[in-house]
């Protein structure tokens, strides 16, 4: 069977965005998971920033991974992927000029699209970890990303955190990013269909939601009617892999009968030690949670 080129996969993702359906992403974190996802018929995968941080650094999602480390993992996936893979490019690893470099490197890695978010990352001295950059700076980043891409089929998706904004503020931000030329709008933290409907009526570009399996947003037909084309439920496959590794090694050591077995969430918490990072951020940066 002939292999699809990176451009072919980008075109396939463009067709997905132009369709009238809603698709759920496979969590893709290495070449093997990319092959499995494609073989199982997933239409699109995503390399999450949080998952990349876990896979590469065994660190929590505190913007610790570097662009080069993230691109290396995306490149490994891009060598074998036969489904469109989106890259969660966080804040673009810096200012608008850094965003341009991010787009250049991830395009070469073979991703079909990438999200650039407007969270103030990495966490800044004396600021809240959920603070956002200004709309003007966010617009500049999207315009810079569009300028940097070579293959026009590469999708540039603007992402914002609906969980820390009023609905009116979300509309202002997303309309601004749409006007700047974003190929799609990604939102995390949308509460329910009522809020989504209020936002969607002001937008014409395809929408992407990070829902973490929010039970209030479980209706693919309704999502599709509102323009949602991509849904990220989370990264269950990655955490299942962590759990399977833990259980297998416990069995190998003869510890399977002990009562202190951990679930996937507990394992992630135990082995990334987020309390240390939170304490350091408070002590050295006066960062508020």
UniProtKB/Swiss-Prot annotation:
Q: Which GO terms describe its molecular function?
A: magnesium ion binding; methylisocitrate lyase activity; oxaloacetate decarboxylase activity
Enumerate the cofactors the protein uses.
Mg(2+)
Residues annotated as binding substrate are 50, 159, 235
Q: Which UniProt keywords apply?
A: Decarboxylase, Lyase, Magnesium, Metal-binding
What positions does the entry give for Mg(2+) binding?
Answer: 88
Give the EC number(s) listed in the UniProt record. Answer: 4.1.1.112
Q: Which reaction does it catalyse?
A: oxaloacetate + H(+) = pyruvate + CO2
The task this protein performs is described as:
Catalyzes the decarboxylation of oxaloacetate into pyruvate. Seems to play a role in maintaining cellular concentrations of bicarbonate and pyruvate.
Oligomer and partners: Homotetramer; dimer of dimers.
Q: Which HAMAP family match?
A: OadC (MF_01299)
> Which family, according to UniProt?
Belongs to the isocitrate lyase/PEP mutase superfamily. Oxaloacetate decarboxylase family.
Q: What is this protein called?
A: Oxaloacetate decarboxylase
